[in-house]
Amino acid sequence: PVVRGNFVWKNGEQDTEVLFDPDPKGRFRVSWMPPTEIRNISKQENSKRVAPNAELGVGGVDSYDLDATVDGRGSKGAFHLYNKFHMEYPSNTFVLEYASRPPLARIFYEDVLKAAFFYGYPVLIENNKYGIARYFESRGYDGYLMDRPAHLSTTKSNVKTKGIPSNSQDVIQSHAHAIESYIHNHVGVNRETGDMGIMYFNRTLEDWIGYKIDNRTKFDLTISSGLALLAAQKAKPKTKPSDFSEKVFLRRFNGR
């Protein structure tokens, strides 16, 4: 059910309507799209565009600030959209995956913006890479960027900042715990209920398998998927986060 393609503005006119253009070499992989009636909704609060479908889903972005021609490294921009629990639509599942390194960072930023607008989902970023935040603000879409979730705040102050710090040990552990919990509950067969979890994006699964918490740089899809899961959390998990320093999410099996 996964389709590759790109999101484009209708007739090339920004801020109108986003369309999905199927392309076997497209940068996006998509397993589900919202019904036509809730796509491309332009909603404003206090004269600012905001995400209209935040109760349905959220996104996570592992961004970069330097153009590929300047940086030259292999790290990609990664992006996931995730559906929360819902009675009508696919629930507790990733519906979009993106891992690409366009030559200009702003192409990546605009890709994220178009998909977020099409779905109407807010996205959570790492605030140590602020290029994407500045871009969204310049385009009038900073209302689509989530503030730091309250349950991930280390202070009791009401200071609101876009995104979360990637160098915080509390955030790093919460991020890893969110992925481990998701895999346990929603990937493969749930031994307690017998239900089969659905995860359509093999590149993300492979990224989870190889993930090393002490060397997170190479695992772009793990970072963005974990940010989406953190964005979907309503409150701080009651279970104490595990120590992931010597842990893998998925065990490797040599047998076929």
For the regions a protein language model found, what residue spans apply to each?
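RNase H-like, metal-dependent nuclease domains and their acidic two-metal-ion catalytic environment used
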Residues: 1-148, 185-256
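Short alpha-helix plus adjacent loop in nuclease-associated cores
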Residues: 145-189
